[in-house]
């Protein structure tokens, strides 16, 4: 037994030792990777990067940047790369002692140092590339500026007439570029690449602005010397022609406004000659806006004349229509009010319409007189005609509505009389059916309903004979009588159908009287109820009796009665 225990302990120890050596082998691989990485980063070409700068002009800012980067290289090597060897050595020693965690910590520190060293190299590489790119950009901008300088100088010399009085100032501004180009050469020779870049970039922007001025100035001069004076002339003679055609354009103030615009235009060329183009554009925009306002006023007058010519005849027709309809309404009201009740407000409205129409006709006559003058402001005439058109349209709509109301009075009276005749005819027909039916007697409630309808009909007939008739009240009463008549007819039909159905049930049930005493008893009760005009209750008892001996028969009998 003891032997087995000893063997087990030995096995466990051997397994533990094997695991430790396995773990140490894995950690050893991590250390070897760190060593490989160290060997790789030691070959990073710091000096080669700096060598690219040495090809440039190592003076001024370039020399300062070169020295700073060289110093950073030394510091990076001492601070990040030098301690790596010691960290790796410590990790190996700790690993031999099976201190896995401590060994891993040393390797992690070594990797962090190498990360920092690589970042330092990457930063140096970016800085070097940036400096080289800036040198290249500076030279490209410089070459472009030299070309622009020559072209601008040649353009002013060759096309001096296009720039007017601004040509001299343009030449002066262009000549200022030459010493600034030379200044760039000095900055570049001194190695001040950042100052050189800022200088040449600013010079390029100024050249682009002056180039845009050179493109804009001929357009401004052409607008100032030709286009606007031509528009002034066209506007002046165009307005003169319109006045001959009868237009009143005094409110446009053509002569005074044009004189003011000419004065304002005279200040534009001096602004152009001083290269104050923003102010020149503002003045030209203001002149064009005022011209547009004048054109809008004139165009409005021309359109107003066309509109006046189109609407004048329409308004004339509408005024005559309103006057004729008003006369017709006055005549109709005098006739209609003898036979029908009419609100006094309707009669007053007609008289008010007459006054308004006469007032509108007077205004229209004044407008026609105004249009017969040698000079007419058609925009005002258009507004006045629109006022007339709106008002006469409202009057015509109201008069037409009133006329339809008068016509409706006669139609409503005829409709009420027709409905009353139909009620009388239908009432007699229904009552005859009640008398001719199988009812033992006409139920008292139908006699009462008939008498009520007769009374209402006599009352309405008396109102028909009175004058003037209040048509609305009369129509409402006839509508109520029609409702009474419909109720009378519906209930009568219901009673007649129930009576026939009850009679059919009793007749059919007679065949079961001898064999079924309970059926005989129920049918006797149904007959008693039938004689007392209680048809619904008689139906209930008869149906119950028949269903007890012949289920479903009552439905068949009911369908036959409905078909009849």
Swiss-Prot record:
**Coiled coil residues, start to end:** 99-138, 190-223, 271-300, 350-435, 471-550
Which InterPro entries has this protein been placed in?
Answer: EzrA
Protein localization: Cell membrane
Q: Which residues lie on this side of the membrane: Cytoplasmic?
A: 24-564
Write out the transmembrane intervals: 5-23
Q: Would you say which domain of life the source belongs to?
A: Bacteria
Pfam families, A to Z = EzrA
Could you list which ranges are Extracellular topological domains? 1-4
Q: Topology with regard to the membrane?
A: Single-pass membrane protein
One cellular component term (GO) for this entry is: plasma membrane
- Keyword terms: Cell cycle, Cell division, Cell membrane, Coiled coil, Membrane, Septation, Transmembrane, Transmembrane helix
One GO BP on record is: division septum assembly
Q: Which family does it belong to?
A: Belongs to the EzrA family.
Q: What exactly does this protein do?
A: Negative regulator of FtsZ ring formation; modulates the frequency and position of FtsZ ring formation. Inhibits FtsZ ring formation at polar sites. Interacts either with FtsZ or with one of its binding partners to promote depolymerization.
This chain belongs to the protein called: Septation ring formation regulator EzrA
Native organism? Staphylococcus aureus (strain JH9)
Q: What is the name of the gene encoding this protein? A: ezrA
